[in-house]
């Protein structure tokens, strides 16, 4: 949606995620105790594999590249901030000025008030850091423990590749 010198677009959930171990090193495509634990030196991002995601990401990227300033209006909270920052990073637009629209209500008055009170996006860097920490720690614990228990004990669940255990 474009007009009056601005454009509005949207994401739907997480369009961007952390790469899988095998994308860092092909040897990690094979699950083995010899390669555990695996923690990347620097986490890399990728698009979630979905045609709708790919199309929407390219729309967002084109708009970000044209923009002089980007306003983040994702959900007010850690995950909303993470969704925006991961997209911003994958678009290579992290050097662009960003502002934050923080909405606690969707009433017309609340939306107008929030637009009048746009904040510097970097005021929310700590919120992003917390979300990123949660995302990366979930990745480290989840992928390493799943691989460990699957290789060590085989499939113990009801079917597919599910692994069940008590923590």
Say what each PLM segment does.
Residues 147-167:
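Charge-patterned, long linear interaction tracts outside catalytic cores
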Residues 1-143, 147, 166:
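Intrinsically disordered, low-complexity regulatory segments
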């Amino acid at each position: 949606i474009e007009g009056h010198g601005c454009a509005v677009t949207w994401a739907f959930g997480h369009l961007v995620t952390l790469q899988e171990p095998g994308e860092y090193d092909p040897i990690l495509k094979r699950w083995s105790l010899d390669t555990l634990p695996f923690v990347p030196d620097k986490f890399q991002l990728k698009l979630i594999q979905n045609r709708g995601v790919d199309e929407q990401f390219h729309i967002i990227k084109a708009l970000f590249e044209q923009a002089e300033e980007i306003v983040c209006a994702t959900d007010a909270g850690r995950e909303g901030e993470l969704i925006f920052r991961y997209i911003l990073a994958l678009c290579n637009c992290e050097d662009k000025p960003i502002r934050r629209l923080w909405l606690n209500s969707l009433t017309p008055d609340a939306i107008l008030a929030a637009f009048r009170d746009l904040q510097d996006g970097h005021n929310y860097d700590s919120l992003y850091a917390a979300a990123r920490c949660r995302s990366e720690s979930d990745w480290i614990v989840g992928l390493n423990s799943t691989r460990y228990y699957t290789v060590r004990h085989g499939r113990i669940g009801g079917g597919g590749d599910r692994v069940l255990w008590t923590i």
